[in-house]
Amino acid sequence: MAYTLPQLPYAYDALEPHIDARTMEIHHTKHHQTYVDNANKALEGTEFADLPVEQLIQQLDRVPADKKGALRNNAGGHANHSMFWQIMGQGQGQNGANQPSGELLDAINSAFGSFDAFKQKFEDAAKTRFGSGWAWLVVKDGKLDVVSTANQDNPLMGEAIAGVSGTPILGVDVWEHAYYLNYQNRRPDYLAAFWNVVNWDEVSKRYAAAK
């Protein structure tokens, strides 16, 4: 079962002006496609070729040593981006405010004190991730936490590989290819804009499944 590039659940220009159409098209058809292609190449002839990518990245300790680096980077990239596209949309909040509601909002308030405090902690994790990587909202032991990972690592890989653990329910890509065309080196501006396109309905579904 070869991995395939997932279709976006919206048009490339759907997230404008916050994330521009050209960035979305290149990010999806070039960068993500490359991760898919390289993951498939590394998986050829292995017993792991039929695993869903989320399961594969949780079992990297079982992967042959000569495949581990390629799969950590490329299966990780495929998993990360597949989630990234899903947790974005045109903003779906109550009364026009793009923020979560219900159990997820209650859990955020419990874990971080307020939604604004959570946003600040998440942005700080993303801003201070040196070089390329991701910031994540994860569920761990039934509780929410904010973590970050380098390169294409994912919390599902576990602490031994990624340095953190948990089930991610929200993630933001801070590789420069995710924002450079529109924001150049202004990562904080990109992160501030990101909140306008988070699909909290999708994040809430992921929280309900992970808690």
Swiss-Prot record:
- What is this protein's record name? Superoxide dismutase [Mn]
EC code(s) of this entry? 1.15.1.1
Note the Gene3D superfamilies from the entry: Fe,Mn superoxide dismutase (SOD) domain, Iron/manganese superoxide dismutase, C-terminal domain
Q: Which UniProt keywords apply?
A: Manganese, Metal-binding, Oxidoreductase
Q: Which reaction does it catalyse?
A: 2 superoxide + 2 H(+) = H2O2 + O2
Annotated Mn(2+) binding lies at H27, H81, D173, H177
Q: How is the cofactor bound?
A: Binds 1 Mn(2+) ion per subunit.
